[in-house]
């Protein structure tokens, strides 16, 4: 932080003022593991192994953060997951 001429503190330009957004995927009793894994790979561009781990986390905990990044990218990922009616939420 630095002070401006009025004595008020300002954030340095290189300090990020906003945390990245997160996509949360919720468990359901409709989709198979293979459907969820395939859609996670498509949406997040992760490996199948990572998608499997995320699918198990969703299954075991009822939900999981499956992606983090800027809001626009999170909206894109969420939209792809919802193509097959998976339930998601974006947190900022």
PLM features per residue range, with description:
Residues 1-92:
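Terminal domain-initiation and capping elements
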